Amino acid sequence: MGFLDFLKPRSKENVESCWPGGKMLQVHIEYNTQETVFTYFGRYGLQFSVPKSNLTNIIVKEVNRTHSVLQLYSGENCVGTSDLLPTEACNIMKNWVLQY
């Protein structure tokens, strides 16, 4: 992602999104229904994409009693890890991804 990419318009026609903590948490996950790709947008520019066909497992890994990370797996490999988020937000994103 380039420095000024945020200025480019992005088509949201075929995109569903989940903001687990609202806009204040600043993280969200999108699903492009046409390309069947999940894209995570985190804080400080963290971003990764995983095709739905490659996604084999979703794990909410607890870091402490209140916070966790969401990990997306393709086979044995972890292909994406979210920011450190409240466990409830991770569970919301996991359930949202599983509905597709």
Segment roles from a protein language model:
Residues 24-65, 76:
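Phosphoinositide-binding peripheral membrane targeting modules
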Residues 2-17, 56-100:
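Acidic, Ser/Thr- and proline-rich intrinsically disordered linker/docking segments
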Residues 10-24, 33-34:
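N-terminal topogenic membrane-targeting module
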